[in-house]
Amino acid sequence: MRLSRLLIGASLGVALSSTVFTAALADVKFGSLYPISGSLALLGEESARGLELAVDEVNAAGGIKGEKVVLERGDAVDNNQATGEARRLISLVGVKAIFGTYSSARVIAASQVSELAGIPYFEMGAVADEVTGRGLQYLFRTNPTAENMAKDSVDMLIKGIAPGLGKDPKDMKIGIIYEDSSYGTSVAGHQEDNAKAAGLTVVLKSGYPSNTVDMSSLVLELREKGADVVMQTSYQNDSVLFLQQANEAGYKPLAIIGGGGGYSMQPTADAVGHDLIDGVFDADYTQYAVNTSATPGLTEFVEAYKAKYGSQPRSGHSLTNYVGAKAIFQALNAGEGFEPDQIVSAVKALDIPDGQTAAGYGVKFGKNNQNERATMMGMQWQDGKLVTVYPENAAIAKMRFKK
């Protein structure tokens, strides 16, 4: 009898350990690679939150193909660390794919590692041309691009801002300023091309390091050139610096059009003051003051964000990453497994029509694995809030002008 009990106990122990082992195998690991410290940490962390919320949602629904998604985090504080963290996540942690990364420079560096290793990399926030322009096999981008941002900036000027000011856009002088990384350089180049193609006059195109502490000479140059429209592609610190120093110098262009980054952040408005930023335009990812009939699921996303993080979303970066991750998870759930070629096949078959995501745009990968349905929107700061004013089907407010 004692022997039987021992055998039963041993068998039960083996069964339990087998169950635990099987459960451990039922986790699928993905890398979450964003700058969560350093100068890009604020928007890096905001972007990562979108991925985290998508993971929470898919796990609550039973995971992907019955497996729980586990995020393994890496900090892409600079390009070298982004590369090192990609190696660690792939070689030591054994992630099946990497999601990230917000910064164009960081993803360009890190994705070289994943490409050589044959591990899929899903970029959900960086806009530079070079991200997908290298023709990598395992890199996919779900979000809109620098070209989208530039085109929307110029279109908004021609179709909305100039008429609202009672001006012929061809009579207006445009100054283009930008932080000089891959992000700013790409957007500014497309802005210049789009403006010139439309017959507009660009009087200045000038880059600067994003960590600059003085933009007074650039403000002076814009003023001397007579720029009455300024397009700035920038992070938070340089957005704040330009707005403050332009104000101090008494330089008041007819319109300022931001290119996402710092111009989409509530902390930027709070830092410079709501009166100063009032009327400033912005071309960027879908934000939250938008016609929700064009963005199904956005309200639920905001509620989930507030429940998890205890505040309103700080910018549309979290939403864009959430939408991208959800789309990839949907594809993987319909796919055959988590081997690299199975993942690639699954996401290439993805076909989400426009108007069916919380960002408004659809998802279908085309040339160079870029989401060919991704688009941006036009916003304006009004009464301390960033509200959507363009295009018409997504707008909740009319453009305002200080004539």
Curated annotation (Swiss-Prot):
Alphabetized CDD domains for the sequence: PBP1_ABC_ligand_binding-like
Does Transport count among this protein's keywords? Answer: yes
Signal peptide (from-to):
1-26
InterPro entries in the record: BCAA_transport (IPR051010), Leu-bd (IPR028081), Leu_Ile_Val-bd (IPR000709), Peripla_BP_I (IPR028082)
GO BP: any one term: amino acid transport
Record keywords: Amino-acid transport, Signal, Transport
**Free-text function comment from the UniProt entry:** Component of an amino-acid transport system.
| Family listed | Belongs to the leucine-binding protein family.
Protein's recorded name: Leu/Ile/Val-binding protein homolog 8
